[in-house]
Amino acid sequence: MQPLMEQIRAFRLHLETERNLSPHTLAAYDRDLRQFAAFVAAEMGDSATAEDVDHLLLRRYLAQLGTQIRKSSQGRKLAAIRSFYRHLLRLGSVSRNPAELIATPKREQRLPFHLDIDQATALMETPTEEENYGLRDRAILETLYSSGLRVSELTGLAIRDINLAGGMLRVMGKGGKERIVPLGSRAVRAIQEYLDSRGGGTATAPLFLNSRGDRINRRSVARIVDAHVHEIAAFKHISPHTLRHTFATHMLEGGADLRAIQELLGHASLSTTQKYTHVSLDRLMEVYDKAHPKARTPEPEE
């Protein structure tokens, strides 16, 4: 029987020729399986084969990884090993798949960062008319916060997609799904002032332009958001998506229904929207602790 490393090389060739995977995915498989093979060789010697590996050895490998990388990366490496063994099972090269006995490590729940209301309000005021592109930048910030758009949705807007009189936006979301989202009065005013300053435009013209008069791109929007955020607070990094998180969190804290927020954000699944409930529950507990008389820490007895 072939040593493990030779079996991995054969599997990689299969992925490249039969599965037509991208170079990036192939490199990830190769890197993860070579790391696994190095651990097996250190434990069992260079002549060890895939059949020699049992679930106990695999558990030790994952335990070692647990001290070095995140659970999401552990899960990816385990998935690569599972695929490798499934391939060997189909070929009859092994009698079992030890990776099937190992549960995928649960990913850490990372709560989305958001600005508080005072920070969001201050951010909207940072661009000024005196600055180059100040009106444009304010319109961009107000639109992101007012409607919770993805940055790709914002950069894809044309003038015909906005209804300033009705306070509405037509957005093309993921998977080519169109949705209508409200546009707050501050955003309406900011967009109107921006369009007036540039002399309007045709219906099909991009809503937001760069310095050359072309459609603004996502990288430029990210730079705009980051630059203005640093005027109000010393955050390490804030992205346009932070304003999307901020929109959703403030909507929920204001009493909006989770289903309505799902529709506004263009989420296909409610489970994607539910992450914002964790943020708001933290806020509710903070309010409860401060406001409810029985929630306060009792004074120590003399």
Swiss-Prot record:
Keywords: Cell cycle, Cell division, Chromosome partition, Cytoplasm, DNA integration, DNA recombination, DNA-binding. Residues 2-89 form the Core-binding (CB) domain. The keyword Cell cycle applies. The active site is at R150, K174, H241, R244, H267, Y276. Residues 110-289 form the Tyr recombinase domain. It holds the Pfam family Phage_integrase. One of its GO terms (biological process) is cell division. InterPro entries: CB, DNA_brk_join_enz, Integrase-like_cat_sf, Integrase_catalytic, Integrase_recombinase_N, Integrase_SAM-like_N, Recomb_XerC, Tyrosine_recombinase_XerC/XerD. It comes from the Bacteria. The keyword Metal-binding does not apply. GO terms for cellular component: cytoplasm. PROSITE patterns: CB (PS51900), TYR_RECOMBINASE (PS51898). It is found in: Cytoplasm. One of its GO terms (molecular function) is DNA binding. Site-specific tyrosine recombinase, which acts by catalyzing the cutting and rejoining of the recombining DNA molecules. The XerC-XerD complex is essential to convert dimers of the bacterial chromosome into monomers to permit their segregation at cell division. It also contributes to the segregational stability of plasmids. PANTHER family: PHAGE INTEGRASE-RELATED, TYROSINE RECOMBINASE XERC. Forms a cyclic heterotetrameric complex composed of two molecules of XerC and two molecules of XerD. Belongs to the 'phage' integrase family. XerC subfamily. HAMAP family: Recomb_XerC_XerD (MF_01808). This is Tyrosine recombinase XerC. It comes from Pelobacter propionicus (strain DSM 2379 / NBRC 103807 / OttBd1). The gene is xerC.
